[in-house]
Amino acid sequence: MANHRMSEATNHNHNHHLPYSLIHGLNNNHPSSGFINQDGSSSFDFGELEEAIVLQGVKYRNEEAKPPLLGGGGGATTLEMFPSWPIRTHQTLPTESSKSGGESSDSGSANFSGKAESQQPESPMSSKHHLMLQPHHNNMANSSSTSGLPSTSRTLAPPKPSEDKRKATTSGKQLDAKTLRRLAQNREAARKSRLRKKAYVQQLESSRIKLSQLEQELQRARSQGLFMGGCGPPGPNITSGAAIFDMEYGRWLEDDNRHMSEIRTGLQAHLSDNDLRLIVDGYIAHFDEIFRLKAVAAKADVFHLIIGTWMSPAERCFIWMAGFRPSDLIKILVSQMDLLTEQQLMGIYSLQHSSQQAEEALSQGLEQLQQSLIDTLAASPVIDGMQQMAVALGKISNLEGFIRQADNLRQQTVHQLRRILTVRQAARCFLVIGEYYGRLRALSSLWLSRPRETLMSDETSCQTTTDLQIVQSSRNHFSNF
């Protein structure tokens, strides 16, 4: 009994101060035959055997009560194969299990179990897996915490989108109205553009037809000997610049007829001065257009303008430097205009006098240029004729300057007449000018379109009359016999 009590006391003390080596030796090493007879005594030590059995049972219970490292509830950690799915780890809080009376009362056994658990080594794979899972769980926690804030803000702000939607619907109606109006304007602009394009194409076609008609008339005039040039067919002698000018001049004549009809209608309808002023200003702008066309044509072919093939035959009778004389135009106006004040008459006569002086100066300059050209071409060449022709070409190029100065004089005369006269007098003045040149063109058309049979009948009648006179005179001569 004494030996048994001592063994219990020893067991109690070992529960508190049991060395780790003894426990490790008891767990891993089986008692050998030498252990019973350790002290060399033949008696069997039941106290030591009881102590070993108790410690082995305590270790077994602690291992059963020890929670798993990464999982709870007996489930092992599962690794999901899809990277988008988080790795689920089951962590369980340590729960106190009811232990036996020896474990609940012995604090030493609890310390021993905690020490043994902490001292148990962990496998390398499990530690590596645990380190890889920890940042992943942290990132998931951060993302869930950050995504949780906008979700709450979105749940708190449903009224604001409804207000924005209401505003959008009201502004959408306004935008729809603006869009419809703009679409209507675009359709109208496209329609007008198509009409202008169609009119331009028709105008080009009519100009082409008129150009072909002019070529036919020129060819017929050359065949009849009425064309003064008389140097072959018109095709090779007309340059591209001259042909373009003829086409543009034909278009200008059409616009001139339209402006004349507007002025005539305005005067007959007794329009107001403001409305009539618009018509007169439009005609002046139309009159300036012909001078611009002539300036372009003079650079291309100055002889075409000087000869005046672009004009009607009756107009060519009064041509002066590729146009009309301003002084002759003023004479026509003075004879046709009435109810002019003395101041207006003085201004018109002063304009006529200055125009005549400018015409004489330009005419003298043109005569000097012609004489210089004659002297250059008539002089005998010193070495060869190339230098002589170069000088002659330089003198011919001066013709363009004379044409430009003559057109400036005509343009200034028309603008001065507009300043001297009133609006209605200016409208009447331009109507007289337009009708005068219209009659000249009509006279030329009548003369060119006269039938050939009339000419033949006139020649036949003249020849018959001559023959009759000869016969009658011969009869009278032989009547005495």
UniProtKB/Swiss-Prot annotation:
Family: Belongs to the bZIP family.
Compartments reported by the entry: Nucleus
PROSITE patterns for this protein: BZIP, BZIP_BASIC, DOG1
TM regions (residue ranges): none
GO terms under biological process: anther development; DNA-templated transcription; hydrogen peroxide mediated signaling pathway; response to molecule of bacterial origin
Region (Disordered): 91-181
GO function terms (MF aspect): DNA-binding transcription factor activity; protein homodimerization activity; transcription cis-regulatory region binding
Oligomer and partners: Homodimer. Binds DNA as a dimer. Interacts with floral glutaredoxins GRXC7/ROXY1 and GRXC8/ROXY2 in the nucleus. Interacts with TGA1, TGA2, TGA3, TGA4, TGA5, TGA6, TGA7, TGA10 and PAN.
Residue stretches of biased makeup (Low complexity): 97-109, 143-155
InterPro entries per UniProt: bZIP, bZIP_sf, TGA_domain
The protein, known as: Transcription factor TGA9
The keyword Transport is assigned to this record: no
Bias (Polar residues): 110-126
Disruption phenotype: In the double mutant tga9 tga10, reduced male fertility due to defects in male gametogenesis, with early steps in anther development blocked in adaxial lobes and later steps affected in abaxial lobes. Microspore development in abaxial anther lobes leads to the production of inviable pollen grains contained within nondehiscent anthers. In addition, multiple defects in the anther dehiscence program are observed, including abnormal stability and lignification of the middle layer and defects in septum and stomium function. Reduced SPL levels in anthers.
DOG1 domain ranges (all copies): 242-450
Alphabetical list of Pfam families matching this protein: bZIP_1, DOG1
Keywords noted in UniProt: Activator, DNA-binding, Nucleus, Transcription, Transcription regulation
Tissue occurrence: Mostly expressed in stems, inflorescence apex and flowers, and, to a lower extent, in seedlings, leaves and siliques.
UniProt key word Metal-binding: no
Location of the region described as Leucine-zipper in the Swiss-Prot/TrEMBL record: 204-218
Start and end residues of each bZIP domain: 176-220
Inducing stimuli: Induced by flg22 in leaves.
Region Basic motif: start-end pairs: 178-198
Motif Nuclear localization signal, residue range(s) on this chain: 165-172
Stated role: Together with TGA10, basic leucine-zipper transcription factor required for anther development, probably via the activation of SPL expression in anthers and via the regulation of genes with functions in early and middle tapetal development. Required for signaling responses to pathogen-associated molecular patterns (PAMPs) such as flg22 that involves chloroplastic reactive oxygen species (ROS) production and subsequent expression of H(2)O(2)-responsive genes.
GO CC annotation: nucleus
